[in-house]
């Protein structure tokens, strides 16, 4: 049996539709004015969860129109959605965007297959030059071309800016409800109400296990999986399980390696339009997510969530090997390499290996000689931002933060706090492997090199590696290493060589 097609106006053969006259009173809102339609290609790109959401929203919209007395006869689209089938049918076509003969022709072909008589013969589209209804153009599916402008809402790429503007106009017609705070548009009032909670901070959905609150019900459902430990989404390639379907979709790109979406600014490629849209914020400088506690802004929502745990003190990721807890899963993964001894990041210039990528990047500056942090006051450059911050305190005449015990003054509260541990004897940084404690984090980092065996400071002349910077400087000035020039020493090693 053929699926129902979009309703057609009843009129006699050969009669032209009466032309619309200007100045008429606006007609009542119909379901076809607010409904969203899909072509076969677009329907095939939707995931099962997206199709279920589409069914719910369309039914809710039709119910709202019925309450207002504007529903009219049941559309073929609603009848198709009520059958809960995943197969695309012509009822999903927009009757205002496709020629009338297209839908009727498909219906007649389907009836021919079933052995029925052809009730509605297909009509030919009116030719150019004759009066009558002009056949509308078929819907264009945005191509994922590289190098063209990208829609910030859906992530689709277009060949030129004119096509992008046409796409935006069509989206505005389908999304008539704008947010007064940020201007983002939505198709239905319920979606707008849910979105506005992001601005107001309202969180009406509460977890009955831990009391955490959420602005949307689906976020609460995703959170509750953490308590149950359930991971219902399995990868068919490697068997790995995930809590969210989106995480599984992102993981499967590691097997296929497909990255069809290219950044027009730097050429980097991504597997999904959403990842490309997030990446492009590094070029535009956009940071749409703001912390309500300290007004700090972030490019990604996940970065904001991790940052907010600094204010709440929440650390939901415990280490199974020790008692330490972490605010993000990435920090837990990085910490567990201390127990396993894994060092997956290797230097391409020497044989040094590192457990963290940030440590590798800092180490590679030793080979390149790059110092990306210059002092704006004197021009002196540094390899680390922390070293620059400490150096800039030497230019500051006002040192407002004084030590109560010895009267020494400091330019920053962090330097004063680190200094006061000398008087109090406090050692808040403990080694995970031997429980030895230190007053400063840098001292703990140097100590942990004894356990890992890591030697991040290589001599560029002879290739010998050292655990500490000053050990390399002493080696440069040693008479036993005549080929190692003191000028290439790290930090102030050249000055030490001249002193000797």
From Swiss-Prot:
Region named Disordered: 1-25, 90-146
GO cellular component term, pick one: nucleus
Localisation: Nucleus
Keyword Transcription: yes
Biased composition (Basic residues): 128-137
Linked residues for Glycyl lysine isopeptide (Lys-Gly) (interchain with G-Cter in SUMO2): 455
Transmembrane parts of this sequence: none
Keywords: DNA-binding, Isopeptide bond, Metal-binding, Nucleus, Repeat, Transcription, Transcription regulation, Ubl conjugation, Zinc, Zinc-finger
Regions of compositional bias (Basic and acidic residues) in chain numbering: 113-127
Keyword Ubl conjugation: yes
Zn finger intervals (C2H2-type): 149-171, 177-199, 205-227, 233-255, 261-283, 289-311, 317-339, 345-367, 373-395, 401-423, 429-451, 457-477
Positions of the KRAB domain: 29-100
Pfam family, one: KRAB
CDD domains: KRAB_A-box (cd07765)
Chief subcellular location: nucleus
GO molecular function: DNA-binding transcription factor activity, RNA polymerase II-specific; RNA polymerase II cis-regulatory region sequence-specific DNA binding; zinc ion binding
GO terms under biological process: regulation of transcription by RNA polymerase II; skeletal muscle cell differentiation
Record function comment: May be involved in transcriptional regulation.
Protein family per UniProt: Belongs to the krueppel C2H2-type zinc-finger protein family.
The name this protein goes by in its record: Zinc finger protein 689
Originating species: Homo sapiens
Lineage, uppermost ranks: Eukaryota, Metazoa, Chordata, Craniata, Vertebrata
